[in-house]
Amino acid sequence: MKLVVTEKNDAAVKIADLLGASKPKADKVFNTPVYRFEVEGEEWVTIGLRGHILEPDFTPSLTYKKRGGWEGVTAEGEMLPAVVPDSLAKPPFKKKKPFTADGVELKGWKMEALPYLIYAPIEKLPKEKDIIRSLKNLAKKADSIVIATDFDREGELIGSDALSCCREVNATAPVSRARYSAFTKPEITHAFANLVPMDDDLAAAGGSRRDIDLIWGAVLTRYLTLVKFAGYGNVRSSGRVQTPTLAIIVERERERMAFVPEDYWVIRGAFDGAAAAGPTPGDGPEAFEAPHATARFKAEAEAAAAMARVEGAVSARVASVEKKRRKVPAPVPFNTTSLMAAASAEGISPARCMRIAESLYMDGYISYPRVDNTVYPDSLDLAEVVNAIAANPAYGPYCKQLLSAGPLKATRGKTETTDHPPIYPTAAATPDDLSAADYKLYNLIARRFLATLSGPATVEGTKVTLDVAGEPFVAKGDVLAEPGFRAIYPYGLKKDEQLPALSEGSTIAFNGATCTKKQTEPPARYSQGKLVQEMEKLGLGTKSTRASIIERLYQVKYVQNDPIEPSQLGIAVIDALDKFAPHITHAEMTAELERSMDRIAEGEQTKAEVVETSRNLLAQELANLMPHSEEVADALSDAVAADAYVGPCPKCGKDLQLKASHKTKSMFIGCAGWPDCDVTYPLPKGKIEAVPEKCPTCGMPQVKVTAFRSKPRVQCIDPACASNQEPEVVVGKCPVCAERGLDKNLIARRNPRTLKRSITCENFDECATRYPLPQYGDIVPTEEVCEHCGAPMVVIKTARGPWKLCPNFDCPGKEEEEKAKAEKKGTRSKGGRKTASKK
C-alpha cells in the first residue's frame, strides 16, 4: 500500500480524484477521513493533515546539576540538554516562585523566569492527536510513503513532522516527495511521476522560523503583559516580525505629527475652445480648466499679482501645442506581494486576499498562491492556459485575439525562482461558479495573466501652453490611443482627460481664474497593500506570513483603520521598546535573521547556529529592558487609558472607558472610578471606537460601531437617549398563540437595556415566543408567513438593499436551504472544468 500524506483534507480528496483509476472510496481511520483508490493495480491511500500536527513548546522547567549542567525537563520527565549562559544565576535558590531548589519553573508567567525562558530547550508536542494516531496506523501498513504537502518551507516542515511520526512505527518504508503548483490532472500526474527526495535543509529553515518566533514572541509578549497597567484586555503581544512592522507604522505617524504644513496658493483658469473671447457659459464640450504654469505660489502677494494681471481678460492665446505618445508596459506576473497589493487597491485586505486565494487554489481555479516568482517557467504552456480560461465569456474574445496574433510572449519580472510559477488561473470560472468575493479575486488574477501576454498600451499626451495677459497657463490631457493590455486589465486606469482640438497661435475664450489657498500635506499613512510591499522591501516576514502579521496588529489593537493608524497603545509599545531596546523595533536585525534562514535552506548554515544566535540577541535586549520595567509600565498604562477613553462620567466626572467583561469578553463602557462609581453602559456587538463628537440629542459621548459586514455607524452610548429609540413595529400574529386559540401580535422592538433587537410576542410571559433580528436596518412587516414554520416574514432594508427573511432560527426551511446550497456547491466542484497546467 502506498500512503500519500497531504497538508489538508481537501488536498487528499483532490489528489485521490485526480490520480485514481475510478472514483476513490471515502473511509475513516479513527475518525480521520482517508481516501482509498488504485493506480495500476496498486492500493493507494491519501490522508489529509490539519496543517501542523506537531507544535514547538518550551519544556515546563529547567533543572541544574553541578556535573551535568542545565537541562530542560519535559512533561514526561525526559531530560533535554540546555545551553544557559554562566551569567544567569544557578541553584541553590530560595524556594520562591518561579525558582525551585534545583531549577526554574517556566510554565507560569513570572518576570524573573524570562531570562531563563530564552534558553529553555524546545520540544515538539502533538497538536492533532487523532490525526497522528490515524497516520501511524496507516504508516505501519505502508510499503512506501509519499509526502505531498505544499512545496515551501512551511509545507516541507509539516511533511517532515508527519514523516517523523510515520518513522516511529515504520522505519524502513521508502519515502519520496511530490512537488506541484496546481490541483490539475496534468500537474498532479507529472508530480507523482517525478517524485524527489525530501529536502531536510528546507524543513530545517521552516523549523528555525517556528522556534525563533516562539522564543521572541513568548518572551516579549510575557514581558509586556507582566509590566502592570490598566485597560481592557490582558495579553500585550510582541514578536520578532510584528514589532518592527508596527514600528514602521508608528514612524510614519511620527513623521505626520512632526510635519509642519506650509501655505501655498493655486491659480486655475477657465477656458473655452469653442469661442475666441469670453465670457461663455463654460459648460460646453470644449470648455476646460488649466492651472497656472507656477503650480504653487509660495507667497500670497505673488499669487495676488498674477490674479491682478489676468483680471478683466476675456481671451487667451494658444502659445504652443505639444503632442507626444508614450508606451505603458504591460504588468509583470503576480507573485504573492504584488497580488496582495493589487487586491488591497480593490478593497480586499491582505489577510482576506490570502484566505480567498488559498480557497481558489484548493478548488483548482488558480496555481499555488504563496510565491516570490515573477517569471513564467518554460514548462508552463501559456496557450493551454489561455484556452482553458477562454470558456469565460468575459475573456473569450480577447483570448481568441491573443492566440491568433502568433506565439505568446509574456512579460518578465525581476524575481525568478524554480519552486513555483507566478500565480495564474488554472481553470475557467464565472460569477455563477464562485461567491462574489472569490470571483472578484479570481477575475483580478485571470485578467492579470492575460495582461502579461499582451502588448503595451499607448497613451497620447497633449500639453497646451496658454497666454493670458502675459500669464502662462498649462493644460495637460492624456488619451488612451492604443489600449494594448488595458483592453483586458482596467485596474488602476485613469479616466481619459481629453482637451479640445487647439491650434498654435489661435485665440480662445478666457472665463476668469480662481485663486485657492492650500497647505502642504504630511506623508500618507500606509494602506495594507503598501505596508506589505514595504515589509518585503525591508525583508520583514515572508510571502506566507506578512498578511497574518498585519491582521495580528489589528487584533491586539495596536493599529486601526485603513490606511493604517497606530493606536496610543501601539505608539507606546514602540516608544518604550525603542528607548530601551531599539534593536527589537528595527528591521535590520529581523531581516538578517531572515537571511540566515535562507542560508539554512541552502545548506550554508545549521538550524542550531541560527537559533542560538537569535537567543543571544534577545537575551541582550531583555537585559536592557528589565531595569526600566516601571517606566515601560507607566507608558503602556497611560496609552491604554487614552485609547479606552470615551468621555467624562455623568455621575462622578471620572473617565468613562471601553472595557471587556472578564466572563463574556463582550465590550461595555464603565467608569474608571469603579467600584466607588457603578455607571455602566451596554454596547452592541462589533468593533467599537470612541469618537470626539458628542451626541447632538443629549450631549453624552458617542461611539462608532462597525458590525460584521455592515457600514460603520455612530450612536449615543446612553440607551435611554431618544436617538437610540426605535418605534415598535407589529410584524404579524404569533403562531404559538394561534395554536392555542389566542389572537396575539408579534412586535419588533429594541431592548432598552441591552440594545438588542428581537421580535417578541405581546403574550411573552405565557408563550415565550421570541425571534432574534439583525441589529441594523429598517424593519418592514409583510402579510406573508413562512410556509415552513408559520412565523411572519419580514423585510430588512439596509444600505446593501432590502432582503426578506424568516426570523425563526429553528425554522425547518433553513436546514433545507443549507442542504440545497451544499448540494449545489458539490455539483459545481464535481462538474467538468477545463484546466491548464505545466507540461
Annotate each language-model stretch with its function.
Residues 141, 185-269, 324:
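C-terminal or mid-to-C-terminal helical accessory/interaction module adjacent to the motor/catalytic core
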Residues 149-151, 341-343, 370:
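Short glycine-centered, acidic/aromatic-flanked micro-motifs in structured strand/loop junctions
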Residues 184-186, 367, 373:
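Short, charge-patterned binding micro-sites
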Residues 1-218, 225, 406:
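Intrinsically disordered, low-complexity regulatory segments
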Residues 11, 124-138, 154-162, 184-188, ...:
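Helical mechanochemical/support elements of P-loop NTPase systems and associated helical scaffolds
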